[in-house]
Curated annotation (Swiss-Prot):
This is Putative antiporter subunit mnhA2. The gene is mnhA2. One of its GO terms (cellular component) is plasma membrane. The keyword NAD does not apply. InterPro entries: CPA3_Na-H_Antiporter_A, MrpA_C/MbhD, MrpA_C/MbhE, ND/Mrp_TM, Proton_antipo_N. GO terms for molecular function: antiporter activity. Coiled coil: none annotated. It comes from Staphylococcus epidermidis (strain ATCC 12228 / FDA PCI 1200). Its main location: membrane.
Length: 800
């Protein structure tokens, strides 16, 4: 149950932070209260490392909807532990960083940290979920919390657009993911992930296997910003920098990669998956690195560099996916190398990219700009950030003695050995190596170019609006700690490899500790080999391009992503246009139209049921006895109902409508139901009086002549509805297997204290229902009151 307590603890801290909204002084400490949550979470995951290394996994299952195998099923294994450590440890740094970044006087700190806690809660939920539907719930919660965080500064138009764009794309991917999970349930009859993976061979032979893969890939590609779904990530940079450092570099964008790692033993059985993931990753890596060179905004550069690095990791996920169909120890060694490298670089990327984002946030916060055309010579005012960002950028570029070099060399090693696989021949291997090397060169180029344009050169304070620029120590502390980790990981990589990455590799492989024989030992020196030569080539060419070429003059010649973004905007505008037309057609403020739509849907559902199940055989028909009074009432009601269709005087219509109600009252009397008759009489009288009184408040709308076609259609709808209700009565009469409720009538007085069965039912069963109905009316009344008292934001006095 420890996983349940962990999730409950995070929810508890959300409630505590929510409580700080109640007092102005408490709001200032909301961030420090929220900081306790990632500290507790990271402590929990660190304490579980020894158990996971010994393959002692934690599993919890609480029934939710067991009939369809939807349960609160949580599991902590090596993969979820690694991601949990990244989420929580990076979270500690980001939460503390945010307390220094946000204003304690103007920003709503509790609201921000509630959103951030909700996101961390959702991400942890994704990585420990062992049920596909539960994973989907957490998956969409990350999209919702991301939307709230991106739009935190909601008065900023860019924040609004970025939030909507990211939400639209990631939710679209989430729906595709849900479709894939439903297909898996259709094939296997279970939503439990471990059970699904145990049936992988049977699933791979099913005709829905490929459609399921494509749906899961859509979910992963949209979440992890893969081409062409990458366009939401640069727009999301409108969020506060702590959000960018946490969600859009270290955690949320890794959710899609986590999904593919989790299902690798199943998805890797298809070559469609292997080719698609590998080449989408390579294209994304190349496109992201090339587009980063045409950015002037530091966060824009980091956004596209994140896209590129995610593409690099995705490439390794695709190449290593073939392990699911391996046939020899040599191939197993290669596949495990690639998967291990992907996990290793994922960890390295979280460290150096988060440090870069924090550095950019400090520069922006203190200088008031992120434009590299203005940020020259900043090493003089930001000496600590100069060192932090230089080391982090060089690590991203793959320079020796930094952690990024190790995983980058493993990546190049994976590319050079691709020709050993059945899926790749010489030509494809050459293409893969070429794209990987070119993208790596461009990565080195924009990394060093960013540092050169920001920190080197001549410092001119006149370019900045703020003349007092300084570098607060507490503000810089999280970035400095992350920077120190970069060389530490390089010199003691196997500490992280054995305690974090090895257990994760076991989980990804699907065979547990048996994979240990193939897991590589991370070495800083492998001798002179092809990957080392390629690394040297990348560094030399990257240095030349970064230091010699004036990218400010040639960026307009580089490919632009505007066409894809413009395509999204065009689709979104068309979507809004057609949505507006549809809403105007559907919501036309005509009550009778709404009623007809409701009745039509009801009839359609009933007819669909008859077509699917079939109309039951009529073996018994109960018709109540009736006399002259019932006949007269029926005829009168029919005549009045037909008259209402053609009469246009409002007062006459209300009176006739009331007469129908009073006729129903007489029906109840004839059927010997005096309580119902009295209730109907009171309700009908009050309703009729209120209707007439309300005329004094209604506008004087001119009378409209009856349209014969429309009125005929109304008559048809009414007749069809009447036939539907009668048919349902026939169906109800044929049911003879229902349990008797006569016993309740006998005990009604003793149990409820009511002498009348109707009163007993209303008092015993409808009390709670009536209470909530009253609550709904109160909420509706508050909404109406708000609308009536709403003033136009432009300062006009007229009410909406």
């Amino acid at each position: 149950m420890s996983l349940v307590y962990l999730m409950a603890t995070n929810l508890l801290f959300m409630l505590i932070v929510l409580f700080t909204l109640s007092h102005r002084q408490l709001r200032k400490v909301a961030g420090y209260v929220a900081l306790i949550a990632p500290i507790v979470t990271s402590t929990y995951f660190i304490m579980k490392i020894p158990d996971v290394i010994r393959n002692k996994f934690i599993a919890v299952r609480l029934p939710w909807m067991p009939s369809i195998d939807i349960n609160l099923d949580l599991r902590l294994d090596g993969l979820s532990l690694m991601f949990g450590l990244i989420i929580s440890l990076i979270g500690v740094g980001v939460f503390f960083y945010a307390t220094q970044y946000l204003s304690h006087s103007t920003d709503n700190l509790p609201r921000f940290f509630i959103y951030l806690l909700l996101f961390m809660f959702s991400m942890i939920g994704i990585v420990i979920a062992n049920n596909t539907i539960l994973m989907y719930v957490f998956w969409e919660l990350t999209s919702i919390s991301s939307f709230l965080l991106i739009s935190y500064w909601y008065n900023n138009g860019e924040s609004q657009l970025g939030a909507i764009q990211s939400f639209m794309i990631t939710v679209f991917g989430g729906l595709a993911l849900l479709t894939g999970f439903i297909i898996l349930y259709i094939i296997t009859g279970t939503n439990t992930i471990t059970d699904i993976l145990n049936q992988r061979n049977a699933i791979s032979r099913h005709p829905l296997f490929i459609p399921m893969i494509l749906m899961l890939l859509l979910g992963a590609f949209t979440k992890s910003a893969q081409f062409p779904f990458h366009i939401w990530l640069p727009k999301a940079m409108a969020a506060p920098t702590p959000v960018s450092a946490y969600l859009h570099s270290a955690t949320m964008v890794k959710a899609g990669i986590f999904l593919l790692f989790r299902f690798t033993p199943l998805l890797g059985l298809s070559n469609v998956y292997i080719y698609t993931v590998t080449f989408v990753g390579l294209i994304t890596m190349l496109f992201g690195s090339l587009t980063a060179l045409r950015q002037y905004d530091l966060k824009g550069i980091l956004a596209y560099s994140t896209i590129s690095q995610l593409g690099m990791i995705m490439t390794m996920v695709g190449l290593g996916g073939g392990y699911a169909q391996h046939t020899s120890d040599e191939l197993s060694k290669f596949y495990i190398l690639v998967l291990f490298a992907g996990l290793f670089h994922l960890m390295n990327h979280a460290v150096f990219k988060c440090a870069l984002f924090m550095g950019v946030g400090i520069i922006d916060h203190e200088s008031g700009t992120r434009d590299i055309r203005l940020l020259n010579g900043m090493r003089k005012v930001f000496p600590k950030m100069h060192i932090v960002m230089l080391l982090a950028a060089l690590s991203m570029a793959g320079v020796p003695f930094l952690n990024g070099f190790l995983s980058k060399e493993m990546f190049l090693d994976s590319l050079t050995k691709a020709n050993e696989l059945d899926q790749y021949g010489f030509v494809l291997t050459f293409v893969i190596i070429s794209i990987g090397v070119i993208a790596s060169i461009l990565t080195f180029t924009y990394a060093l170019y960013m540092i050169k344009e920001t920190f080197w050169g001549n410092y001119n304070i006149e370019k900045f609006k703020r003349k007092q620029i300084h570098e607060p120590w507490l503000f810089s502390l999280p970035a400095v700690i992350l920077m120190l980790l970069i060389p530490v990981i390089f010199f003691v990589p196997n500490v992280f490899g054995n305690f974090v990455i090895l257990p994760a590799t076991r989980s990804v492989s699907g065979i547990g500790a048996e994979v240990d024989a193939f897991v590589p030992h991370i070495s800083q020196w492998h001798g002179v080999n092809l990957p080392l030569i390629l690394s040297i080539v990348v560094i030399i060419i990257g240095l030349i391009l970064a230091l010699v070429v004036n990218w400010k003059e040639v960026t307009h010649q580089i490919i632009k992503s505007a066409s894809i973004t413009d395509g999204y905007r065009k689709i979104y505008r068309e979507f809004e246009l057609y949505s507006a037309r549809g809403i105007r057609a559907l919501m036309n403020n005509k009550l009778n139209y709404y009623i007809m739509i409701t009745l039509f849907i009801f009839v359609a559902i009933v007819v669909y049921g008859y077509l699917t199940v079939g109309f039951p055989h009529v073996h018994q028909l109960h018709i109540s006895s009736f006399g002259p009074l019932e006949v007269i009432l029926s005829v009168v009601t029919l005549i009045i109902g037909i008259s209402l269709i053609f009469i246009r005087q409002r007062l006459t219509m209300v009176v006739l409508n009331g007469m129908i109600g009073f006729a129903v009252t007489l029906y109840f009397i004839a059927m010997k139901a005096p309580d119902l008759a009295l209730t109907q009489l009171v309700v009908e009288t009050i309703t009729t009086i209120l209707f007439i009184v309300s005329f004094s408040r209604l506008p004087n709308i001119p009378r409209v002549k009856a349209n014969l076609k429309k009125e005929t259609f109304k008559i048809i709808v009414s007749l069809v509805m009447a036939l539907t209700v009668v048919s349902l009565i026939f169906v109800a009469q044929q049911a003879d297997g229902m349990p008797s409720i006569a016993k309740f009538y006998e005990d009604a007085y003793e149990l409820t204290g009511g002498k009348n069965i109707v009163n007993a039912i209303l008092g015993d069963f409808r009390a709670l229902d009536t209470m909530f109905e009253g609550l709904v009316l109160i909420i509706a009344g508050l909404g109406i009151y708000t609308l009536l008292n709403y003033k136009d934001r432009r300062g006009q006095d007229e009410r909406e």
